[in-house]
Amino acid sequence: MKKRFWFLAGVVSVVLAIQVKNAVFIDYKVEGVSMNPTFQEGNELLVNKFSHRFKTIHRFDIVLFKGPDHKVLIKRVIGLPGETIKYKDDQLYVNGKQVAEPFLKHLKSVSAGSHVTGDFSLKDVTGTSKVPKGKYFVVGDNRIYSFDSRHFGPIREKNIVGVISDAE
C-alpha cells in the first residue's frame, strides 16, 4: 500500500512539475540564421513567458514574439516606443544620437568592409517617424538574412511572449 502511494505521489508530482513548467516557460528552438552569431540555428532556449510583464523591455533585449503569420520569432529590440530610428553608414541612430551595438562587433569584423546593416530610416520602412506607443522595432543580429520590423513594421507589445535580457 505504501509503495503504491509513493508511486502515485511521484507520478502526480512529475505531471504537476511539467504543467507548471509549460505554464511559465516557452521552449523555443532557433530556426534559421537571422540571429547569428548570438544564437545559432538549432539552439534550444527556455524562456520565461511572464518576465516582461513585471519589468521594462530595454533596447537590445532579445524578444520572442508572434510574427505576422503567428509563428513565434526571435529578434533584438532596437527601437522603443516614441523613438526615431535610422541607420546610416552601418551606424544606428536613435533620436538622432549614435548608439553602439557591441553584439555586432564580430559580424562587422568579418564583413570585410561591407555594411552589416543597410541604410534606412523608420519613416522609410514604416511611413511613420516614431515607433508607436505600445510597439517595438526589432531586427535580427544577422541583418542581411533577417525578416524583421524592416519588413513587417514594429511589433505590438501584446505579441511578445518572452524576453531574454542581456544576451550578447
Curated annotation (Swiss-Prot):
It is found in: Cell membrane. Disulfide bonds: none annotated. This is Signal peptidase I V. It is an enzyme of class 3 (hydrolase). Belongs to the peptidase S26 family. The active site is at residues 34, 75. The lineage of its organism: Bacteria, Bacillati, Bacillota, Bacilli, Bacillales. The keyword tRNA processing does not apply.
